[in-house]
């Protein structure tokens, strides 16, 4: 007895599900009539199609679904949708062929099918079992960019381009269809698994420090790689660019563009290698990540080369102590508080009962030498002529005489009891008495006082003594002129010190090297020069210099008759106890 629920005017299925699912035999119940009293012969009336009524039994199943003919090269094509030209294509292989010939034949058949679809415009499949359409996209003019016809046509064109590229590699003389236009550039998208690994920074690994990793991949593959999609651009940037704004709705991906398929495949391989390494290897062991950090430090100038660093724990090169893979050496971390050495404690110190040597004795010896040199003493010996020894530790290793006493720097005011060693320079008491043999830079400067001028002409140097000459009459003086300086005579006076005849010279206060004396007028005419005609001789005791015949005003040369030698008449002898200057001798 049928349930009352199964009988109705809606034409719903009244067959139990368990019976349809597990019973292999066809249902023996007759088909129920529809609301109009007609029966379509199928239980699933809502899936029925009028075209299925006239189809042979071999082209539909018991559920009313359409059957398709399977092809080798791609998506199935319904038989009723195939054109006559497509039905004539020979797909059966009737002769023996090699693998290369079979592959080339299949490529040729698929290429003819795609070309026929593109020529007729029949690119959209008619069956309803197709993928759902993506959200619509529009350009700046409001035209839709991803309609069904555009998407399927682009898909067929990309497939035909790949087939032709592959056929051209296999057959050098292969000819493409006449309507084929090779695209200038080929694009491919490689999606990044950001949703599966949200904690990994794929963008940073792909771009690298200042874009060097991305540039290296582009240089190796010859293709251009661009990162597009969500997360590729910071918020607020790129909104004005329509190309960037259109890609922001897609998932994060790498857009690879090149002019050949090989370059694109090489770039895709490099991108997949980076993604797989980041997803499978921990961050601390990722060589790509470490190389990028090292390269970034090199670009910033903060690189510290650890390859030449010596480990303080194991002594190997290439790592530091905190990264040492070997066991930690606790002995090297123990420092003795008594002697300052490493490797033992103060209880086991070998010099615990002795005065430990200073760690920096060389610096102390240099400092002592410097202080002794500044103090005027010797840096290599003490007062008794013995070599200077260290005051902190003796060479024999025994305790020094001062063992148990405070260190020298703590008892600066105490005197040293040992007579064989002098105290340190910093321990010497400050003495008010001046040293017996001070250093040149410690000697007091001489007082600056004006030299006392003696009024006795005999105490002056020879070159400052006045020449002995006879009394000069006021009538014998000539107008003042600059007298030249002659060696062996007195120094000339300034031009302003000459007085008119009969007027004594005033004293010259503060003249350097000149006494304050009222000296007589020096000769106005140098030796060897004749006075003008009519001028009396300034030195009556000496004969006048005869003039040379024929030349008025010229004197006779030395040695001529009537001439005299001035060098013989001058007294250049130095006073007793005074040596002559260089270049002069006593006559």
From Swiss-Prot:
<dbReference type="GO" id="GO:0005829">
    <property type="term" value="C:cytosol"/>
</dbReference>
<keyword id="KW-0507">mRNA processing</keyword>
<feature type="compositionally biased region" description="Polar residues">
    <location>
        <begin position="1"/>
        <end position="16"/>
    </location>
</feature>
<dbReference type="InterPro" id="IPR032570">
    <property type="entry name" value="SF1-HH"/>
</dbReference>
<keyword id="KW-0863">Zinc-finger</keyword>
<feature type="modified residue" description="Phosphoserine">
    <location>
        <position position="133"/>
    </location>
</feature>
<feature type="region of interest" description="Disordered">
    <location>
        <begin position="1"/>
        <end position="64"/>
    </location>
</feature>
<feature type="region of interest" description="Disordered">
    <location>
        <begin position="121"/>
        <end position="142"/>
    </location>
</feature>
<feature type="zinc finger region" description="CCHC-type 1">
    <location>
        <begin position="309"/>
        <end position="326"/>
    </location>
</feature>
<dbReference type="GO" id="GO:0008270">
    <property type="term" value="F:zinc ion binding"/>
</dbReference>
<keyword id="KW-0963">Cytoplasm</keyword>
<dbReference type="GO" id="GO:0005634">
    <property type="term" value="C:nucleus"/>
</dbReference>
<comment type="function">
    <text>Necessary for the splicing of pre-mRNA. The BPB1(SF1)-u2af59-u2af23 complex has a role in the recognition of the branch site (5'-UACUAAC-3'), the pyrimidine tract and the 3'-splice site at the 3'-end of introns.</text>
</comment>
<feature type="compositionally biased region" description="Basic and acidic residues">
    <location>
        <begin position="44"/>
        <end position="64"/>
    </location>
</feature>
<dbReference type="InterPro" id="IPR004087">
    <property type="entry name" value="KH_dom"/>
</dbReference>
<feature type="compositionally biased region" description="Polar residues">
    <location>
        <begin position="465"/>
        <end position="483"/>
    </location>
</feature>
<feature type="compositionally biased region" description="Polar residues">
    <location>
        <begin position="563"/>
        <end position="573"/>
    </location>
</feature>
<dbReference type="Pfam" id="PF00098">
    <property type="entry name" value="zf-CCHC"/>
</dbReference>
<protein>
    <recommendedName>
        <fullName>Branchpoint-bridging protein</fullName>
    </recommendedName>
</protein>
<dbReference type="GO" id="GO:0000243">
    <property type="term" value="C:commitment complex"/>
</dbReference>
<feature type="zinc finger region" description="CCHC-type 2">
    <location>
        <begin position="334"/>
        <end position="351"/>
    </location>
</feature>
<feature type="modified residue" description="Phosphoserine">
    <location>
        <position position="131"/>
    </location>
</feature>
<dbReference type="Pfam" id="PF22675">
    <property type="entry name" value="KH-I_KHDC4-BBP"/>
</dbReference>
<feature type="domain" description="KH">
    <location>
        <begin position="191"/>
        <end position="271"/>
    </location>
</feature>
<dbReference type="InterPro" id="IPR045071">
    <property type="entry name" value="BBP-like"/>
</dbReference>
<feature type="compositionally biased region" description="Polar residues">
    <location>
        <begin position="379"/>
        <end position="399"/>
    </location>
</feature>
<dbReference type="GO" id="GO:0071004">
    <property type="term" value="C:U2-type prespliceosome"/>
</dbReference>
<feature type="region of interest" description="Disordered">
    <location>
        <begin position="551"/>
        <end position="587"/>
    </location>
</feature>
<keyword id="KW-0747">Spliceosome</keyword>
<keyword id="KW-0508">mRNA splicing</keyword>
<feature type="compositionally biased region" description="Low complexity">
    <location>
        <begin position="410"/>
        <end position="454"/>
    </location>
</feature>
<dbReference type="InterPro" id="IPR055256">
    <property type="entry name" value="KH_1_KHDC4/BBP-like"/>
</dbReference>
<dbReference type="GO" id="GO:0048024">
    <property type="term" value="P:regulation of mRNA splicing, via spliceosome"/>
</dbReference>
<dbReference type="GO" id="GO:0003723">
    <property type="term" value="F:RNA binding"/>
</dbReference>
<keyword id="KW-0539">Nucleus</keyword>
<comment type="similarity">
    <text>Belongs to the BBP/SF1 family.</text>
</comment>
<dbReference type="GO" id="GO:0000348">
    <property type="term" value="P:mRNA branch site recognition"/>
</dbReference>
<comment type="subunit">
    <text>U2AF large subunit (u2af59), U2AF small subunit (u2af23) and bpb1 interact to form a complex required for complex A formation.</text>
</comment>
<keyword id="KW-0479">Metal-binding</keyword>
<dbReference type="GO" id="GO:0003729">
    <property type="term" value="F:mRNA binding"/>
</dbReference>
<dbReference type="InterPro" id="IPR001878">
    <property type="entry name" value="Znf_CCHC"/>
</dbReference>
<keyword id="KW-0677">Repeat</keyword>
